[in-house]
Amino acid sequence: MEELEQDLLLQPWAWLQLAENSLLAKVSITKHGYALLISDLQQVWHEQVDTSVVSQRAKELNKRLTAPPAALLCHLDEALRPLFKDSAHPSKATFSCDRGEEGLILRVQSELSGLPFSWHFHCIPASSSLVSQHLIHPLMGVSLALQSHVRELAALLRMKDLEIQAYQESGAVLSRSRLKTEPFEENSFLEQFMAEKLPEACAVGDGKPFAMSLQSLYVAVTKQQIQARQAHKDSGETQASSSTSPRGTDNQPEEPVSLSSTLSEPEYEPVAASGPMHRARLVKSKRKKPRGLFS
């Protein structure tokens, strides 16, 4: 199920309007099962099931219908796709949800092979680790990315001001006075933004502005974070493997190495490890007086 969890992390948040309920949700459906995450900006709910649960629940909700888990999951994907990813083509299925103390139930009513098909997603409160993975860490990354983006734009504006100044010093004159601008002052700009634009810019509302405007950046940030974690994991495994791997020369005494012999013999030719001739060569090499760099 690790593949399913990672795929869910890479999915953007979608804004859903179900009757009077405004929700943010993301879903991943594969041949192995599905994972669903839903939030009303007050709580976060989650469900992840495999094919065995899909088969059992389908039998309980649809007595007349028999289908393999792969077909059921494919149908659920087709029913949810317009709701989550293609709002221009409304889904033929109908959706509703109920919230209770124990969790949230998302109900789906559709048709499969000409027969009524019903499905219930039974979501329970998400763990703190899931909330951190899908909201806290990605949103912190998005904030840092946007801050870096603003700094890059500010640096570009300062370069533009220097370019305009160079044109003016060379005698260039602006033909349209209405296009004239003042040199960019970052601190003044930030102060004005905080005072005039911030209340409107940070209005979260029902989550729709976030889901509609920052999907691509959210996915890019989560992908980068997954790659960073994987690289860190691989590095740790490599270090652990190198520290525990046996060394064949640990129990052998170190012999002094002659720098001159090393320079004169750049290529190492392996020889047989047995036989009297080999032992004689070893004994002879030990009797040599090591030669230093200045000897």
Curated annotation (Swiss-Prot):
Q: Where is the composition biased (Basic residues)?
A: 278-295
Q: What happens when the gene is disrupted?
A: Embryonic stem cells are highly sensitive to ionizing radiation and have intrinsic DNA double-strand break repair defects. In contrast, knockout mice only have a relatively mild phenotype with no growth defects, neuronal cell death or overt immunodeficiency. Mature lymphocyte numbers are slightly decreased, and pro-B lines, while ionizing radiation-sensitive, perform V(D)J recombination at nearly wild-type levels. Mice lacking both Paxx and Nhej1/Xlf show embryonic lethality caused by severe defects in classical non-homologous end joining (NHEJ).
The subcellular localization recorded is: Nucleus; Chromosome
Which GO BP terms sit in this record?
Answer: B cell differentiation; double-strand break repair via nonhomologous end joining; immunoglobulin V(D)J recombination; response to ionizing radiation; T cell differentiation; telomere maintenance
User: Which ranges are annotated Polar residues under compositional bias?
Assistant: 237-251
**Coiled coil location:** 128-170
Phosphothreonine: residues bearing it: 262
Keywords, alphabetical: Chromosome, Coiled coil, DNA damage, DNA repair, DNA-binding, Nucleus, Phosphoprotein
Renumbered ranges of motif XLM: 285-295
Any idea what job this protein has? DNA repair protein involved in DNA non-homologous end joining (NHEJ); required for double-strand break (DSB) repair and V(D)J recombination. It is also involved in telomere maintenance. Plays a key role in NHEJ by promoting the ligation of various mismatched and non-cohesive ends. Interacts with POLL (DNA polymerase lambda); promoting POLL recruitment to double-strand breaks (DSBs) and stimulation of the end-filling activity of POLL.
Q: How does it assemble?
A: Homodimer; mainly exists as a homodimer when not associated with XRCC4. Interacts with XRCC4; the interaction is direct and is mediated via a head-to-head interaction between N-terminal head regions. Component of the core long-range non-homologous end joining (NHEJ) complex (also named DNA-PK complex) composed of PRKDC, LIG4, XRCC4, XRCC6/Ku70, XRCC5/Ku86 and NHEJ1/XLF. Additional component of the NHEJ complex includes PAXX.
Q: Which family does it belong to?
A: Belongs to the XRCC4-XLF family. XLF subfamily.
Official protein name in the record:
Non-homologous end-joining factor 1
Originating organism: Mus musculus
Organism ancestry = Eukaryota, Metazoa, Chordata, Craniata, Vertebrata
Name the gene. Answer: Nhej1
